[in-house]
Amino acid sequence: MHFETVIGLEVHVELKTDSKMFSPSPAHFGAEPNSNTNVIDLAYPGVLPVVNRRAVDWAMRASMALNMDIATNSKFDRKNYFYPDNPKAYQISQFDQPIGENGYIDIEVDGETKRIGITRLHMEEDAGKSTHKDGYSLVDLNRQGTPLIEIVSEPDIRSPKEAYAYLEKLRSIIQYTGVSDCKMEEGSLRCDANISLRPYGQKEFGTKTELKNLNSFNYVKKGLEYEEKRQEEELLNGGEIGQETRRFDESTGKTILMRVKEGSDDYRYFPEPDIVPLYVDEDWKARVRETIPELPDERKAKYVNDLGLPEYDAHVLTLTKEMSDFFEGAIDHGADVKLTSNWLMGGVNEYLNKNQVELKDTQLTPENLAGMIKLIEDGTMSSKIAKKVFPELAENGGDAKQIMEDKGLVQISDEATLLKFVTDALDNNPQSIEDYKNGKGKAMGFLVGQIMKASKGQANPQKVNSLLKQELDNR
């Protein structure tokens, strides 16, 4: 028997507002524990929540960017549960009247485009954070009340690979809207996954399992791959899948049972009595719609159709707004489009990955990178020299030409000097001359390599090729 995998994702995104969802406390990451709190966050008796208007605007902006319908009538509800980092013993969320419904995004997997439906987007407040260490439980309520949106996909995803592509695309769109930075390492984007299997051709869904502790897109993919295999083996052996919540263990790559899954009845939802229902008229919707910036698909189309970039380059450059903005800034400073694309996808990305930093953490600017690329383009700097200059540019900033001169890496373009390197290479490699005469193309490349080695990579490669060909033809 063969099974079809059915996956749905629930993504929590922290909104990048200055204050919390229902209180004026700061909503910034990284403060001292319990310093960003007030009487509302601590659930003092008698205090009343006040809705953050900007959070509502941004939830609407995100919904619109995800092609969703905005509800004219929406409301908040209480989700009741007890936990030490939830001082009210309930969370203010939205149950049956979310702010956004019926959206979609298009993903690309193996060259094919697929549309993934989005059921709903609703607003809620985050809980605090509990840390368990050495027999003690520590509670930090800084995060309590931080504005969240939860984005719930339709069960349209059919593989862990599609789930990864969906998350990449979703993060990209949300980042472009400016409502969140979507940093998983800081908790501003979190994902839970629901997965079930059913025999091919069966319409009814199988029993789903929820996966938690998925701290990166890669772990989402790995957790789903393991669970897909586990459920298939269980079903083939005649077993049954329970409705469970399971935790992904990063060290073993396996999922571990946490608890039997609760249903919505367990939370005893009821309308929040301290907040009036939201009425979103057409004027409000129109004002928010005007704030939606250019989104990744629009930029990608522009890069392909207007700038002539390959589809792959355009896809990589538009994955994050930071990289896309940097690319546009560099070409605005006169850098060649394709050379800039190659450097951002190659040397720049390698540097960022190696040092585990983001563009904003470096001293790179669109202007100084464009300056280096223009030197490469006009032949002043070889690619080999550029690779030696670039780390200094990224770490300390400055001017690429000045760095090149300070390091004694100025490219040799003087013909007399280059001719000496050429003749030395020919005199030392008579067999290569013979090979060239006999039509062996590799001989030319070998000789160029010898010249570049002798000049420590500083010889102008274009002039070397020209002079070498002349000398070979004359011998």
UniProtKB/Swiss-Prot annotation:
It comes from the Bacteria. Gene3D superfamilies: 1.10.10.410, GatB domain, N-terminal subdomain. InterPro entries: Asn/Gln-tRNA_amidoTrfase_suB/E, Asn/Gln-tRNA_Trfase_suB/E_cat, Asn/Gln_amidotransferase, Asn/Gln_tRNA_amidoTrase-B-like, GatB, GatB_C_1, GatB_Yqey_C_2, Gln-tRNA_amidoTrfase_suB_CS. Its EC number is 6.3.5.-. It catalyses: L-glutamyl-tRNA(Gln) + L-glutamine + ATP + H2O = L-glutaminyl-tRNA(Gln) + L-glutamate + ADP + phosphate + H(+); L-aspartyl-tRNA(Asn) + L-glutamine + ATP + H2O = L-asparaginyl-tRNA(Asn) + L-glutamate + ADP + phosphate + 2 H(+). One of its GO terms (molecular function) is asparaginyl-tRNA synthase (glutamine-hydrolyzing) activity. GO terms for biological process: glutaminyl-tRNAGln biosynthesis via transamidation; translation. Keywords: ATP-binding, Ligase, Nucleotide-binding, Protein biosynthesis. Heterotrimer of A, B and C subunits. Allows the formation of correctly charged Asn-tRNA(Asn) or Gln-tRNA(Gln) through the transamidation of misacylated Asp-tRNA(Asn) or Glu-tRNA(Gln) in organisms which lack either or both of asparaginyl-tRNA or glutaminyl-tRNA synthetases. The reaction takes place in the presence of glutamine and ATP through an activated phospho-Asp-tRNA(Asn) or phospho-Glu-tRNA(Gln). HAMAP family: GatB. Belongs to the GatB/GatE family. GatB subfamily. This is Aspartyl/glutamyl-tRNA(Asn/Gln) amidotransferase subunit B. It comes from Staphylococcus epidermidis (strain ATCC 35984 / DSM 28319 / BCRC 17069 / CCUG 31568 / BM 3577 / RP62A).
